[in-house]
Amino acid sequence: MITNTAKHYNDDFEAQQLRLSSVNRGKWVYQLVKSFLDAGMTWDEICEGIREAGRYKGYHDFPRTSDIREFAEKFATEDLVKVNDGRVASLTDDEFVWEVNYCPMVEGWLKSTDDPEFLEKLCDICMDIDRGAMDTYGWELELKGTIAKGDGKCTICMRKGDGCACGGK
């Protein structure tokens, strides 16, 4: 069973507007992926396209640095914290663990489907944006739990490594 309830920033107008925007983004991501699958694309083909978009994001939206702490500061913005009820769970010189306690995209997906397998795959494929960004640093990304899988929160571990995405498919 999916638990996905925002506990903080519920009275913050800006946070609510950003969340609504992300719910809508979740709806159109669902429709795009569903359309791609219906047109004959595979999950792997969709994954690679999303990952390439993440590589672009990595090169253009984040600082070019070898310092994971500097990256974490630019990643975990105040807006992202508010939208996702997020927090930095751990930060060392080699590892950044980001925790998401509410996902507006999952809320959007649940308006279209309650298929647990599809939701889990959709979540994983959306994380290819971040995997692609990690590729640009030669770092790894591992999902240690996701809201879409029923874990109650997403735990996203980004760490310095050999560049393979330890989250895998």
Which functions belong to the PLM regions below?
Residues 121-134:
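A conserved amphipathic terminal alpha-helix motif
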Residues 1-124, 140-154, 159-169:
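N-terminal accessory segment detector
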Residues 137:
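Conserved ATPase active-site switch/coordination loops adjacent to the nucleotide-binding site
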